[in-house]
Amino acid sequence: MPVYNAPLLSIDAAEARRYAGLQKAADFNEGKILEACEDTRLLAKPRGIWEIYDYDCETQTINAHPPCLLQGKKIGQHLAGCEKVIALSATVGEDIEEDITRRFSSGEYSSAVLMDAAATAAVEQLADGMEKAISPKMAAQGFLRKWRFSPGYGDWPLEQQPELIRLAKAEQIGVKLTTSMMLTPRKSITALIGLYRKQENSTAEHSPKGCAACTQKNCPSRRK
């Protein structure tokens, strides 16, 4: 199982602003966002891990040991035409979460919210970096990739998080689940990436992703 430990050299302040719901707050102090991004970067302990499996798109089954039957129509549609899937997990560690909690407890609400948003941007950025590292390896084997899809997207139930934790071997980087199926450390993700051969799924790269694929039209973090 490949492990990804590339450092975060910076955190995208525009993404942190978006996650904080400040896209329309043009007069908000940009320096505070940049400060939150830098504080987060210094505390981050970025780690990622991934594993590749054969996939049967007809039955929505990941051929692991034991096999994993994916539930939900949306994930099945998303992985249509895929021969393999990559199960991945990424985290920026616990130190950020502890600092955010400390700031809330001491009444530093604004900085805590901004740091929470920066941490979300950081873990997504980490996962983006993993995808970029994976892509050429898969391309060398004749595969293109779809964008990552996580439990909770569409109708893919959070109840399948334990399966994804197992498939990605996420506990090896310290990512676990609470009894309510939430990831810990909180700024962590799990996801599947579908792999397909272009002649079998020539339009896959044009399928909607992220905010464009989400039904929450009024989300304050929605990309413009």
Where is each model-derived feature located?
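Active-site helix-to-loop segments that bind/position phosphate- or nucleotide-bearing substrates
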Residues: 1-115
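Conserved active-site and cofactor/substrate-binding residues in soluble primary-metabolism enzymes
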Residues: 28-31, 35, 121, 125, ...
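Structural signal for hydrophobic packing residues in well-ordered secondary-structure cores
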Residues: 37-44, 134, 138, 215
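Sparse, context-dependent recognition of short Cys/His-centered cofactor- or disulfide-binding micro-motifs
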Residues: 70-77, 103, 108, 132, ...
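Short terminal or interdomain "cap/linker" segment that borders an active site or interface and mediates
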Residues: 92, 141-220
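Internal, well-folded beta-alpha domain core
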Residues: 108-168
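Short Cys/His-rich "knuckle" micro-motifs
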Residues: 222-224
